[in-house]
């Protein structure tokens, strides 16, 4: 069961598609968000969640104070789950009289990134299916530059794959392993 861990929508249960996604575990999400909060990154953030799955990363950010979250998901069933979860979190935030802008984009990441950016995002989550290659992630990161302004980029990968060679314009700030998962912290 995936849930919002903390913030104004904390403890709300999110829906998940049957097998189309691999949601980030609560333990890893809590670690990611503790670090983001300690760096004062979340409050008022403009968040982009690529390969969104259930939308849990973006919606956790919304619960903790992000002003805007866009979730990009190619799979139609998973995108529908993102929409349902967005409604759950938006309703909870509305009860608290918090204004929040959320959007689900049902496109492939490469198609989304090929369109001109209308927003400068300052917090990006990239948690692709493990079968996505490092070359594809590097291509995504190259295209993503047009959408970023003083951004923190969090990339989740299988610990069984080599670390990507980060493209120009990105600095690897840190990496941390959690069993089968490794989280990379980039600044752009």
Where do the PLM segments sit?
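Class I S-adenosyl-L-methionine-dependent methyltransferase catalytic core
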Residues: 1-188
